Design a protein with these regions (language model features):
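N-terminal cap/leader regions of alpha/beta-hydrolase-fold enzymes
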Residues: 1-171
Length: 171
């Protein structure tokens, strides 16, 4: 099952950044090849997928918009780096190629409020086009309607902000 595959990858220390970037590039190339494509493409993700979306926006040039939902490990300490994830994604902030929307719960522990502050300060310092929204009553994974961490008001607002952002940046 997909859950079994995800568990096996997590148990093995996560997916290598290079493999993720290759997969994301291939997906974007496919979307852009479709007859219905307008030539623009966005990327988004939650949790480690938020990390991957930010990383893709920095390392790949194909994206016109990036949405990072509570991206865990965008800011990594030296002792968190591994062979599969050798660089903290925030080290690539200057290379961000697209506008970014960030959605974060203030009760989250990955990323913490302080990490979100640092992430935002780095984007601002680099002169990047960014928009961050924080939800004081939400924690990690507040979109996940099937889980106890779901926070409806934050999720509804976040989805609206995401659809609006993509509409503005991809049309």
């Amino acid at each position: 099952t997909p859950e079994d595959v995800a568990a096996a990858i997590r148990a093995d220390g996560g997916a290598p950044d290079d493999r993720v970037l290759g997969d994301v590039q291939a997906a974007a190339d496919y979307v852009l090849s479709l007859p219905s494509s307008n030539g623009k493409v966005g990327v988004w993700g939650t949790c480690s997928g938020g990390r991957h979306a930010f990383l893709a926006g920095c390392k790949l040039t194909v994206f016109d918009a990036v949405v990072e939902c509570w991206g865990g490990n965008v800011i990594m300490a030296q002792d968190q780096l591994t062979e599969k994830q050798p660089v903290s994604p925030n080290e690539y902030t200057n290379d961000l190629n697209a506008p970014i929307l960030g959605l974060f719960g203030d009760l989250d522990q990955s990323p913490t409020k302080e990490q979100v502050d640092q992430h935002e300060a780095e984007l601002k310092s680099a002169g990047k086009d960014y928009e961050f929204h924080r939800y004081p009553e939400a924690g990690h994974g507040f979109f996940y309607y099937h889980a106890p961490i779901y926070h409806q008001a934050s999720a509804v607002d976040g989805w609206e902000k995401m659809f609006d952002f993509f509409s503005r940046k991809l049309n």
